[in-house]
Amino acid sequence: VALIVIRCGSDVSLELPPEATLLDVSAVPTRKELRALDDAAAIALPHDPTPTLDEIAAQPDVRHLGTPELAPQAPHLKDPLRVVVVGTDAALSVVLTRMMRSDYLWAELGFVPVQESTVARNWGLPTDFESALSVALSAPVRPVPLIRNDAGLAIAGSASISEWSNGEITGEIIVDDHVVVRHEATNTTGIGTYGARLVPMVDAPGILAAKAVSPVAASASFGLAADTAKPSGFGAWLRSKFSSPAAPGQLDEDTVCTGRAVQAGGPELRVVVDGVSAKRPVNRVTFYRHLRDLQVVRP
């Protein structure tokens, strides 16, 4: 097995087998830093004889969107390639995006989180570093769906859709044919309708989502100042006496639903993938299950 360990912006000590290749990259790797990964994939599989993405999409059935499956390229590999990412969920998202765009998701993928991680919870990874490293190096592959958006970004642990200003959302969010959010913003600062959070599942259909009833994150994390505007009018002043800003990240458990795709539309939406916000607002976004599954190494 060819083993590449990508250590992202960290000097954490790693006990690795002698055959491992260690890549030290930025906390959020650049495309240039990941070229060695592209080269390793090309050596492991110089030619992919399996159906292309276009050919899979043209298939009349949807078998490829059922239970996640082992990569069909496995029997054709010169040597299996295992990639282990040591870093944050955001770092893993960048590596996944690179693998997805270059179409070598057949590579085995392990993850060793260096801080609190939604990915680790989703995949059932150990909470201590040494155990997580051991799993990443030696555990078998258990495929999971890969969720991406229409901007070509892969989601490692979670994503959110909210108002660009971080206030209540104006817009609509739909999971398959189920409406999770349909709302026009008001001036509330407490519990309200702020958007939705979604996480990839480890099985079909692929996406779990729920309505956000408080800001998806603290305004400071988006480079926004906290809202210090004084309430306008007697009604707004009266409401302010009986409400307070809601703690970020609260979800409405009664709205939890699953599906293969999430679509959203609104005047100024903020899209956040694994804690990293898009640089500018959009008026529509779609998250959906990719045609190839992730070959995840997990317990």
Summary of predicted features, one role per range:
Residues 249-299:
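Extended, charged low-complexity segments
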Residues 4-9, 17, 28-36, 42-79, ...:
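Catalytic core of DAGKc-family lipid kinases
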Residues 11-13, 163, 294-296:
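Short, acidic Gly/Pro/Ser/Thr-rich loop/turn segments
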Residues 13-21:
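Short, aromatic/basic amphipathic alpha-helical patches
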